[in-house]
Amino acid sequence: MFDEMYYEENNIIPKEEYKHIIDTLHKEKKFRPARISVVRKVFFNREINYLTDAVSVNQENTDSYCVMMTDWDTDHLILEKKSKREGLISKSYTRLSEEEFERILDGDYEWMASARESIFRDFYLQLTINQLRPGVVVDYERQAFRMNSKKEYMIFDLSIRSTYLFTKDTVLSPLLGQTERLEQNRVVVTYKQMAELPGFIYRMTGIKQKHQCLLPEFA
């Protein structure tokens, strides 16, 4: 399991401005070249803000859970917990097999109750006590740039499609029908900066400092 803490800013820009930024970034050697991937997130809540990647629309302090898949690779699913507290975002994530995801969809949660990784135990409580269920499937056509320092990211969402209508058989399918949420010729840009916190904060929260630069490139 890995943990991250960071700050982020989001905005919607015209596609022409996006192209100008991309041209500039490609000229800057401090940025790694970036490909475009499709990131599917199965969120376990229905009321999400597409601009801020599932942070709740109406609440400043909130948590969200999702299962993430990149480029239709079902062999490398990720369970992700994203929390926002007074502007600071923390994210925990771990590997999830397709079989484990199917067990969750079937309502088989007990195996998570005594799991070694805390994110599974937290998710188990949310599923059993708060009755969280898969609520919306969102696909992001995403391009992520990471600076060489590994502490700053610039992420562009060229398309954001979603649906509330899915089944166990279609939830990971690339053929799942969805509705575009971005206006035409608009791009969502997100700037992320990893948080540098005092050592005692990591000790209090249990987050390991050595994992602070392991944010998945398209998360």
Feature locations, PLM:
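Phosphate-end processing signature that detects enzymes handling 5′-triphosphorylated RNA
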Residues: 1-219
